Amino acid sequence: MAKKILVVDDEAHIRMLYAEELAEEGYEVITAEGGLNLLERIEREKPDLVVLDIKMVDYNGLDLLQDIRNKFYDLPVILCSAYDTFKDDMKSIAADHYVIKSFDLAELKTKIGELLEDPA
């Protein structure tokens, strides 16, 4: 059975890109536009890993990460941002990895592979 990844990003083209690229790697990918009902969605969908944008229009990804950690402490989370200014904060908020958003998903795929080992 394929590992399930939840991609949370407010930009539709990013969600689509990540979903297509990660599906090609053998993962089952589900997406969310933001943090509304995110904890309930995680409870229902039971993803193996979350890829979480930090800067979203209606939600702060760092706050969402804390909420995820409080309820699903062992769920791997990779933070993504177009800015590298959050890299130092990542350690203090307990994200598993931090990657800079890019159309080349090599780094993201590597980090996902490290956390999930094999895609299927």
Regions found by a protein language model. Name each.
Residues 16-24:
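Charged docking surfaces used in two-component/phosphorelay signaling
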Residues 33-34, 60-63:
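Acidic catalytic/metal-coordinating carboxylates
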Residues 40, 62-72:
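Short amphipathic alpha-helix used as the core "switch/output" element in two-component signaling
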Residues 103-114:
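C-terminal output helix
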